[in-house]
Amino acid sequence: EKYLTGMTPKKILRRPGPSTQPDWGQNLPPILQRLYAARGVTSDEQLSYTLKRLASPMELRGIDRAVQLLATAIFEKQSVMILGDFDADGATSTAVAMVGLGMMGLERVDFRVPSRFADGYGLTPGIIERLRDEGELPDLLVTVDNGIAAVDGVRVAKELGVSIVVTDHHLAGEVLPDADAIVNPNQPGCPFLSKNAAGVGVMFYVLTALRKHLREINQLPDPQPNLGSLLDLVALGTVADVVPLDHNNRIFVEQGLRRIRQGEARPGILALLEVAGRDHQEISSTDLGFVVGPRLNAAGRLDDMSVGIACLLADSRDEALRLARELDTFNRERRTIEKDMKAQAQDLLASMSLDLEGLPWGLALFDTDWHQGVIGI
């Protein structure tokens, strides 16, 4: 085996199917039996994508404490800041948090998204210090799709008197941030079965647990929050983040697609489909991943993801279309930049003198002028 010098080798391992196969009977074609086995499907229940099949939110470690903090923020009219991420999962997570918490009666809620170029990823000390300098420090800060690695950012925030709820899905490091609550299926000791949840799915679960708590203490606002109306956003973030579609995630995607096809999606999602020339009644998960997702991601790649979040939060078709067209323009520009960078890389490769017998499995090319927001595609 050959690897590039200085790189850590990674092996691609086959995942064997279950040792025992269920008896599907003679009505199921062999090809479907093989496909089901490859995806770990062993029962009819796993082919049911109704919402009642979702795993319980109460299995998520830390969710009780997160709910307590959010409920207190509602009752005491505290200020809450949602700190998102600059990709599609981060944008949909932010939108779900903004809309969902508003449904629950939270009056003082706003969001911030780090700049890919000025701030880097996640909750950093610099972001907290800027909020302090601008007089925008919240009572409670909620991270979505980030935060599990923000040890220093959380420390600085707490030193300034800010309570922190981390909601994330990324793998935890050796040291966890000293947040007031952490909700992450991949944190140590969390029994939640769906380790493949996207950030938007984790935030959705926090909202379902919060609604359950408010219902139990007779504090749900009227009309009662319909969290099902957020499933179009959950489906979009789940597909766009390319997380494995386990049974739980398939439920999210199936239910979200149903809402979109029925025209019951957020105006921003319908507008993004419209500017791309797609009929919302005919869409599939492919459209979320390759049509809507890239247009949303383009904002964070080239400019500021706040534009993408504003599109998802837009209440009117006109406002959503205006922002969707702006995102479409960003995406066209992103394609041009990507095409030019690829051509430059191919020209650079063609100009190199290579020993064809001693080539490694891959070559990495670098140019300081290549766009940092596009280089990772």
Cite the ranges covered by each PLM segment.
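Active-site cavity-forming subdomains of large catalytic enzyme subunits
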Residues: E129-V200, F204-P221
